[in-house]
Amino acid sequence: MSSDANLNVLWARALLEELVRGGVRHAVVCPGSRSSPLALACAGTEGLRTWSVIDERSAGFFALGLAKQSRAPAVVVATSGTAGAHFYPAVIEAALSHVPLVVLTADRPLELQGWGAPQTVPQARFFGEHARFYADLGQPEAHDAALIHMRATVARAVVSAWRAPRGAVQLNVPFREPLAPIAEPFPEASLSALAKSGRAGAPLTRIVPPEPVPDASTLDEVRRRIAATTRGVIVCGPRDEMDGFAAAISALSQATGYPVLAESTSQARYGGGPLTLSYYDAMLRHAPFAKAHRPELVLRFGGGLTPKVPQQWLDGSGADTVLFSDGGGLFDPAHRASTVVEGSAVAACEALTRGLARGVGAWARGFLAAEQRVRTALEAAFAEQPDVLSEPRIAREVVAALPAGAPLFVSSSMPIRDLDAFAPAGTVPLRVLANRGANGIDGIVSSALGMAAAAGRSAVLLTGDLALLHDVGAFVTASRTRVPLTVVAVNNDGGGIFSFLPIAQVAPRDTFETLFGTPHGVDLSHAAALGGARLHRPETPVALRSAVREGLEGGLHLVEVRVDRNANVDEHRRLFARMAASLGEGPWA
């Protein structure tokens, strides 16, 4: 009997070897029969951590979270039929947020296709244009050419997931029976060592992407523009890499004298420098300040800003905009960029900083003075209601409870907006991630679990109740994987963000509640029970902080904070009004 029980075992082993040699370190496997060879190969491959997740949709987002945190491709495995289709939302998010993901879809053999065989659907290019690369690896064959071709194709697929713009790739893998490692002789002796074992310690085909070095002459031109312009801002949108970006942005801001507008998920807001603003959203809602502080030059990094008002301010400023794209994407829907600089954002910052030494002038001091007024007003407004847990206060307290380096995942909709608007930037570095590619609320709990799993430490998720219910099955995933996570769920019994949109003013109240407010009345303690989570229901800021800190010690925790949707709208208006009033008519320096 050969060292591999049968040809399927050999084929799957070789496939997983190439994935690991290409940099994959995590595999997420969903149960299924046709995928048995792949599942067993995942479990038996050295250097690969394998996670078992029952539900494919949860598995896809769990793998996405693994890849977002580790910045290395994760592999996710499904059996034949509709199983792989449940990965579609995660694949879309991976494509739009540039996260490397390898999807393995097991398949029935060619002779069963198109003849009504059970659990058999067309799986070719399952994910359409959302996949960076697709290949059908073909039926396992005991021939050198077939095995070597398969290994080389897998190596190419991994590089395609890694290479900018990063994203998901699909490998379709058909198997005939036997699917279990049952002894079935095949001509192993006729296979070369290269076909059977590949190149030890390296992919069969090593494809080296070009170095992401920004063009020096373009950077020289941008540096000249900076030197000629005092009225500039640095804008940092969503960006997953923690590669020294915060320090590089801090150095650039101090060299240029430009204030920094950094989102929570930019990896530049926490651990940044003295010119990193906390409350630019509130400041720019104040028309006199916004008009007096229109920039002439904008240096943009990462994706587009989540808050609407700052983005409108930028789009309407008429400023010369330079977009730095280190992920291969063009996040410029308003087409304001006159120049796009591709390559490492950190390298670009470092190159621009050399030769610039303007320092902090009147332009930046105007922003800092306004920031201090707004900060004082916000703190006073919160102090008036010291024991009230409003949605803005929840976001603020969650961040305050986190130690340096703590992983935080944030849901789309209101949580990410409240974090940006009401939680101050700080010098303590935090790892903050969100699914801001498609901006959906699906798979949020699963993504956070993947983040925590890759981080190897307890993480915190800040989410709304609808996003939690959308992914409530992830509590089963949490229970089975034993990944430590603290879920802070803002429960306003529905979709709170719709109360801020025009539809809330024009739709009849009953219609609005039925179609948009969507009150559910679900007792979230059942979600906690589903995963064996410890349930906390804090009612004060102090109690919330305590619950989050307890959760960070380990285990699965659900921290439910009940709030009123209508009161939430009033509180946002109260806080923004207080912050705006603090700015007055100027001057602000």
Curated annotation (Swiss-Prot):
Protein name: 2-succinyl-5-enolpyruvyl-6-hydroxy-3-cyclohexene-1-carboxylate synthase
Cofactor(s) required for function per UniProt: Mg(2+); Mn(2+); thiamine diphosphate
GO-annotated biological processes: menaquinone biosynthetic process
Lineage, uppermost ranks: Bacteria, Pseudomonadati, Myxococcota, Myxococcia, Myxococcales
Family, similarity comment: Belongs to the TPP enzyme family. MenD subfamily.
A GO molecular function held by the record: thiamine pyrophosphate binding
Pfam family, one: TPP_enzyme_N
Function field: Catalyzes the thiamine diphosphate-dependent decarboxylation of 2-oxoglutarate and the subsequent addition of the resulting succinic semialdehyde-thiamine pyrophosphate anion to isochorismate to yield 2-succinyl-5-enolpyruvyl-6-hydroxy-3-cyclohexene-1-carboxylate (SEPHCHC).
Keyword annotations: Magnesium, Manganese, Menaquinone biosynthesis, Metal-binding, Thiamine pyrophosphate, Transferase
Pathway info: Quinol/quinone metabolism; 1,4-dihydroxy-2-naphthoate biosynthesis; 1,4-dihydroxy-2-naphthoate from chorismate: step 2/7; Quinol/quinone metabolism; menaquinone biosynthesis
Entry's EC annotation: 2.2.1.9
HAMAP family with a match to the protein in the record: MenD
